[in-house]
Amino acid sequence: MSSARRCLFGRPTPEQRSRTRIWLEDAVKRMRQEESQKWGFDFELETPLPSSAGFVYEVIPENCVPEFYRTKVLTVRTTCSSLDISSTTLTPLSSPSTSDKEEPSLMDPNSSFEDEEEPKKWQFREPPTPRKTPTKRQQKMTDFMAVSRKKNSLSPNKLSPVNVIFTPKSRRPTIRTRSSCSPY
């Protein structure tokens, strides 16, 4: 069963999709250029613009930068029972043993942006495959509440409730037949 979707204005044609995509790309490009001019920094190349007179960028040591802004290596933590963990960390393509603390350009305040190599590209390793994938089923309302079915002890062709008497000893109903009942 497919998920429900709402299409308020009808399905777009391929031409409308391409026009929308072009419009969005132009808007993003315009916004990037405005921000680049505003801050004097090329965010795509991650370098300062040469003509930026308003800002002076300088390299600072890593220990002077707050922890929030430091580059970190991400690890994935999972339980061993559900996944086969072989290696789930991110590593740079250049060398897996390089860490940010050992990198000389981060520690050397005299280095410039031009001396840097191209930025490292991070390679995501394949996520571990689950050993057993549980099948999802659509839950029912009765899964969330207790359901008790009421027994209908008196059907239309049985005796009326007037003839059912509860005795104090057994707590079971005693059913009298019409022949044994007195009218009074």
Curated annotation (Swiss-Prot):
Region of interest (Disordered), residue spans:
85-184
- GO CC entries: nucleus
Q: How does it assemble?
A: Interacts with cyd-1; the interaction is direct.
Full protein name: Cyclin-dependent kinase inhibitor 1
Family label = Belongs to the CDI family.
InterPro entries, sorted:
CDI_dom, CDI_dom_sf
- Main location, first listed in the record: nucleus
